[in-house]
Every structure is written in C-alpha cells, then in structure tokens.
Amino acid sequence: TRSGDIRYCEFAVTRIVYKGEDANLVSVRNITDRKQMEDELQQSLVKLENTIQNTLQAMAKIQEARDPYTTGHQLRVAALAQEIAKEMYLPEEWIRGIHVAALIHDIGKIYVPAEILSRPSKLTTSEFALVKTHPSVGYDILKTIEFPWPIADVVLQHHERLDGSGYPRGLKTGNILLEAQILAVADVVEAMSSHRPYRPAHSLDTTLEEISKNKGRLYEPDVVDSCLWLITGKGFKFN
C-alpha cells in the first residue's frame, strides 16, 4: 500500500467466453488477515515445540541424575539417530519425531533403583530382568501424552530386534517401527563406545563390527549402512 503496509492477495483465474471469444476472468481476494493468523499460529507451534523439547530434556536430566555413568547418553543417541534418519532421507516430521523419542528413550529407568544402574559388577538375573522393564515403564509414562509422533511406541520398541530376540515383546521383522529400529542402532553404538561402571568403552572398530555383523539379523540393514557411512564416510563423532 502507499503507507508501506504489506497486503497479501490471492488470485484466481477462470477461463470464460466473453462476447464469443475465450477470455480470462481474474478475481483478487485480500487474505492479509488469514496470512497473519497463519503466521501467528506457526509462531505458537514453534514456541510449543520448543517448550516440549525443553521439557523432554529436563525429563532426561532427571533420569540421568540417578545414573551418572550415562549422563548425556540420550542426547548423544538423539544426535546420531537424527543424522541416520537424515541419511535415509526420511521426511522432516519423522526426523523430528525420532529425535524427540531418542531424547527420552530411557525414561523408564527412573523405576530402576540407582544402585542397580550404577553397580560396577555383573547384575543378577532378577536385577537384569528389572532393568529390562524400562521400555515398558517408559511406554506407560508417555502413552497418555498426545505427541504428533508415536513416541511411546518407539520408546517401547527400542530394544526389540529383527530376529525376535529383543525385549519386552520379542517383536520380529515387520512388526517393529522404523523409528525404533533407527533408535536401536544409535543406542547400541553410543552405549558400546562409552564407559560403563562394569566395563571400559569399546573401540570404534569393535562397536561398528557389532552392528555390521548383525545387519539383517538384529538390526535393519538400511539403518546399519547409513550409520556406518555416517561414521566412516562422513566422520560423525559424538560431542
């Protein structure tokens, strides 16, 4: 406008016959108010997503505070899982959902006593069985939260394996969400390459050999290939 205000318009062109000849009828509609409402809605969604992200990171820190040996584990897994998803050219919305799920994938460990999580010796059978409940506990914590992604199911399935040897449900190929399969590989790589109270960190070669030799048996082949290329070809490193 002459005053410098910006106005948004929508144009529609209709083919008509005018006085016996083909013509175009052009209609113009002022959609400035609608555009402003859309912009405000988008800003609100961005703020909401940032709030969700900050809340999830706070939840992760609460859980990790009980297990100092895994501090930062979920953030590092989230970073790798996100890059794997990008390497696989997944839709942006999927990538965001995978990142969110990874940030809190171990939230169910809040149910496991801290002395078990940080014990420097081998766990008993019953203690390990308790640790293995954390995907189910995480699912119960998250299932009533209305995320725009299947976060609770991804958390529930991140320890499932293609051959059915995983837990908690022993799911097999075709029944495990791709997001959970990506998270599974990222989780294994980060966990093996990090120090734990009961063992030193594995070498990078040993870690990559684990996912490579079990490609197609435990881990989804495309996910493994993308992860291997990220680390060996593109030089991905955990911060």
Residue spans of the language-model regions?
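Sensory input modules used in signal transduction
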Residues: 1, 13-15, 28, 173
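Short loop/turn elements at sensory-signaling interfaces that couple input to output
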Residues: 11-24
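PAS-family sensory domains
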Residues: 1-4, 161
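Metal-dependent catalytic cores of enzymes that make or break cyclic nucleotides
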Residues: 40, 46, 53, 57-239
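Conserved Rossmann-like nucleotide-binding pocket used by diverse enzymes
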Residues: 24-27, 103
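Compact sensory input modules in signal-transduction proteins
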Residues: 4, 11-13, 98
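PAS-associated C-terminal cap
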Residues: 29-43
